[in-house]
Amino acid sequence: MNKIDKLPDDAVKIINSEDYVDKKGNIYSFDNRYGHSKDLFIREQTISNGYKYCNVRYCINGKYKNITKKVNKIVATAFIPNPDNLPIVMHKNNNKLDNRVENLQWGTVSP
């Protein structure tokens, strides 16, 4: 993880998580594993099947657990309304590694 000084202005907290996401698709985490200061880091992202994935720390039933999620879904859930409850996140430019909010939209799979 890369340490940084502060969250970007457009970063928002991920629902049910202690982590944050910005409009560029970066995931941020405060690390206090050693009980000292809470250092801020950009979380590492891995690539699988052409998509970026990231471990996010979620609170489930009062307990914290790291869950691997697609970065595009994290960004879209945080910034793009989905009133029709569409199931998938699509990349407008077909580049699955480009998770900027302006490149994402909710959609469905064609039959």
Name each region found by the language model:
Residues 1-88, 95-111:
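Conserved recognition-core residues within compact binding domains
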